[in-house]
């Protein structure tokens, strides 16, 4: 089932998400719906807060980026209760976009490597060291479960320059190919 994407300005995107337990209701169905919604909206990642749930669940498929970023080849994950344990010292700046911030792309500086622990959809524990763009994708999605957005990492001047676009998103004056929930009313369209 396709789920609507919550847009910038909706309060759920600013909540720090909670860990869940293996008995979370209809978890497999939720993961399948999140994955379907991610693909339908041409995303490479989706976090549960982006569909209105303040829980620590991420779905990622960065494989479509493999031509430009070989480290993304086959990089498909479901990450539950993810926690970044360590961030590398080396930084890299790349453009990022977000389904919750349609039509906005800005340069964001992030560590080039991270160490993350999480459980998969079967609640099997994992710890991985990720590099390059795969690390960037995970950090971007991870921000969502910590109540952050990629625009929180841009300069105040850049944020001022996109203020009009951000206001339009809040007001729902944005076109997308996917269903959205706008702020502050939460009205679906």
From Swiss-Prot:
Its EC number is 3.5.1.88. It comes from the Bacteria. One of its GO terms (molecular function) is peptide deformylase activity. It catalyses: N-terminal N-formyl-L-methionyl-[peptide] + H2O = N-terminal L-methionyl-[peptide] + formate. Pfam families: Pep_deformylase. Binds 1 Fe(2+) ion. Keywords: Hydrolase, Iron, Metal-binding, Protein biosynthesis. Fe cation binds at residues 98, 140, 144. Signal peptide: none annotated. One of its GO terms (biological process) is translation. Gene3D superfamilies: Peptide deformylase (3.90.45.10). The keyword Protein biosynthesis applies. Its cofactor is Fe(2+). Coiled coil: none annotated. The active site is at 141. Belongs to the polypeptide deformylase family. HAMAP family: Pep_deformylase. PANTHER family: PEPTIDE DEFORMYLASE. Removes the formyl group from the N-terminal Met of newly synthesized proteins. Requires at least a dipeptide for an efficient rate of reaction. N-terminal L-methionine is a prerequisite for activity but the enzyme has broad specificity at other positions. This is Peptide deformylase. It comes from Porphyromonas gingivalis (strain ATCC BAA-308 / W83).
């Amino acid at each position: 089932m396709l789920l609507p994407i919550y847009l910038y300005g909706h309060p759920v995107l600013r909540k720090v998400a909670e860990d869940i337990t293996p008995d979370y209701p209809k978890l497999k169905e939720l993961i399948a719906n999140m994955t379907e919604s991610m693909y339908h909206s041409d995303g490479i990642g989706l976090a549960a807060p982006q569909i209105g749930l303040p829980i620590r669940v991420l779905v990622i498929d960065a494989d479509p980026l493999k031509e430009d970023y070989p480290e993304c080849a086959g990089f498909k994950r479901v990450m539950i209760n993810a926690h970044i344990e360590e961030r590398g010292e080396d930084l890299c700046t790349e453009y990022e976009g977000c389904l919750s911030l349609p039509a906005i792309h800005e340069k964001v500086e992030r560590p080039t490597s991270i160490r993350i622990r999480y459980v998969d959809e079967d609640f099997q524990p994992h710890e991985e060291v990720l590099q390059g763009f795969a690390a960037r994708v995970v950090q971007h999605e991870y921000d969502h479960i910590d109540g952050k957005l990629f625009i929180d990492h841009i300069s105040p001047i850049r944020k001022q320059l996109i203020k009009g676009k951000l206001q339009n998103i809040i007001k729902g004056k944005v076109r997308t190919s996917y269903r959205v929930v706008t702020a502050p009313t939460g009205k679906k369209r």
